[in-house]
Amino acid sequence: MRKALKKFLKNSKCLLSIITILLYWYLRFVYFTSRQKFIFYDNRNKEKFLNEQGVIFAFWHNMLALSPAMFTGHRNVYALISPHLDGKILNALVGKFGCQVIVGSTNKNSIVALRNIIGKLSQGANIIVTPDGPKGPVYKVNSGITEIAYRYNKKLIPIVSSTSRCFRLKSWDKLIIPIPFGTIKIIVGSPLALVADKVKNHLNLEKQLKSLTESLKK
């Protein structure tokens, strides 16, 4: 039954469009009624954050619904989104918030997606990725994004977010759905110190994201 419903949604462009519009206006209302609190590491501030160019930002998959709040004001931003059903909805949704899309994944040897990422970074665009997506496990980095950052000498910055008012979906990542009139907390970490060791870079990104996630509770 669940598979049949997913197949129906995937093939129903009209229904997907309606869902996207409803989600967009709901999130707009949430962001309008919520207070935002940014915390910056590494001597950064909001102005520097908004003016970053050619940077990769990484955050956990369950924070996707908070990502428009994270990147409001950024220009020339591309989100790496999977071709799955939830990706199709996100594809349309992020576009309404001014973010462009690269369809694919860095853990599936998607040559087209990798070329697009590298090309956009070289043009000064910023890329946002969820390194534990698209299917988990939650809070476990399974993406090759650290290899791209090291090879092309690009900054890789971890970023996390939470909200004081939310509910969670019964998905693999317990997706956070913000509720109006809360406080959205966003922590922008320091760029990772990347080395020639792929495994160390991979584990370092995971460690930093987990550490920042714990900091959200303080």
UniProtKB/Swiss-Prot annotation:
Topology in membrane: Multi-pass membrane protein
A single Gene Ontology CC term: plasma membrane
InterPro entries cross-referenced by the UniProt entry: DUF374
Transmembrane domains' residue ranges: 14-34, 175-195
Localization of this protein: Cell membrane
Chief place of localization: membrane
Keywords: Cell membrane, Membrane, Transmembrane, Transmembrane helix
Superkingdom to which the source organism belongs: Bacteria
Family: To H.pylori HP0270.
Record's protein name: Uncharacterized protein RP090
Naturally occurring in which organism (per UniProt): Rickettsia prowazekii (strain Madrid E)
